[in-house]
């Protein structure tokens, strides 16, 4: 009995060792998603907001053409990946059931070289995300819904 329990624990611990990097990678991709697209309490939502946020998030060398920031709470965004606040959309994507407050920053001018200047578009939109292991890892698009 003790031998069987010891073997079980050994196999269990080896399994944890194999899955931990995968879980850590998923968490890393989720944190990257939040870094690029999440701002709980935006200050303003105008062109200056976009210039500042894009610079702060490291998207200005070279200048990124477009980026959308989602405003709200993380739990609601994560819920898109489940049935609580999301529905299947296309292949391997999920669309939010409820609209989110968002700010989309579009690069003004054509040069990808700094200084980068952005035009802000604020609104409420349903968002489409790719999920891995119940976490959003990619913002595919945002859709205005009447």
UniProtKB/Swiss-Prot annotation:
GO BP field: actin filament polymerization; angiogenesis; antibacterial humoral response; antimicrobial humoral immune response mediated by antimicrobial peptide; defense response to Gram-positive bacterium; hematopoietic stem cell proliferation; innate immune response; negative regulation of apoptotic process
Activity regulation info: Has weak tRNA ribonuclease activity by itself due to partial autoinhibition by its C-terminus, which folds into a short alpha-helix that partially occludes the substrate-binding site. In absence of stress, the ribonuclease activity is inhibited by RNH1 in the cytoplasm. In response to stress, dissociates from RNH1 in the cytoplasm and associates with cytoplasmic ribosomes with vacant A-sites: ribosomes directly activate the tRNA ribonuclease activity of ANG by refolding the C-terminal alpha-helix. In response to stress, the angiogenic activity of ANG is inhibited by RNH1 in the nucleus.
Protein species of origin: Miopithecus talapoin
Disulfide bonds: 50-105, 63-116, 81-131
SMART domains recorded: RNAse_Pc (SM00092)
Molecular function per GO: actin binding; copper ion binding; DNA binding; endonuclease activity; heparin binding; protein homodimerization activity; RNA nuclease activity; signaling receptor binding
Annotated motif Nucleolar localization signal, positions: 55-59
EC number, as in UniProt: 3.1.27.-
Pfam families in UniProt: RnaseA (PF00074)
Keywords: Angiogenesis, Cytoplasm, Developmental protein, Differentiation, Disulfide bond, DNA-binding, Endonuclease, Hydrolase, Nuclease, Nucleus, Protein synthesis inhibitor, Pyrrolidone carboxylic acid, Secreted, Signal, Stress response
Chain positions recorded as tRNA binding sites: 45, 105, 127
Entry GO CC: angiogenin-PRI complex; basement membrane; cytoplasm; cytoplasmic stress granule; endocytic vesicle; extracellular space; growth cone; neuronal cell body
Residues annotated as catalytic: 37, 138
Stated name of the protein: Angiogenin
Location(s) in or outside the cell: Secreted; Nucleus; Nucleus, Nucleolus; Cytoplasm, Stress granule
Major localization listed first in the record, in broad terms: secreted
Pyrrolidone carboxylic acid modifications at: 25
Secretion signal span: 1-24
Presence of the UniProt keyword Signal in the record: yes
Family, per entry: Belongs to the pancreatic ribonuclease family.
Self-association state and partner proteins as the record states: Homodimer. Interacts with RNH1; inhibiting ANG ribonuclease activity. Interacts with PCNA.
Function of the molecule: Secreted ribonuclease that can either promote or restrict cell proliferation of target cells, depending on the context. Endocytosed in target cells via its receptor PLXNB2 and translocates to the cytoplasm or nucleus. Under stress conditions, localizes to the cytoplasm and promotes the assembly of stress granules (SGs): specifically cleaves a subset of tRNAs within anticodon loops to produce tRNA-derived stress-induced fragments (tiRNAs), resulting in translation repression and inhibition of cell proliferation. tiRNas also prevent formation of apoptosome, thereby promoting cell survival.
């Amino acid at each position: 009995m003790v031998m069987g329990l010891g073997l079980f624990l050994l196999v269990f611990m080896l399994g944890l060792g194999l899955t931990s990097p995968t879980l850590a990678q998923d968490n890393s991709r989720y944190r990257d998603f939040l870094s690029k697209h999440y701002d709980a309490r935006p200050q303003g939502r105008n062109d200056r907001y976009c210039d500042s946020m894009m610079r702060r998030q490291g998207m200005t060398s070279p200048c990124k053409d477009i980026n959308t920031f989602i405003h709200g709470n993380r739990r609601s965004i994560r819920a898109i990946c489940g049935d609580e606040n999301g529905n299947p959309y296309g292949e391997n994507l999920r669309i939010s059931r409820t609209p989110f407050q968002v700010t989309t920053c579009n690069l003004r001018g054509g040069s990808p070289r700094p200084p980068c200047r952005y035009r802000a578009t604020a609104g409420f939109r349903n968002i489409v995300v790719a999920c891995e292991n119940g976490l959003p890892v990619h913002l595919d698009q945002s859709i205005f819904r009447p």
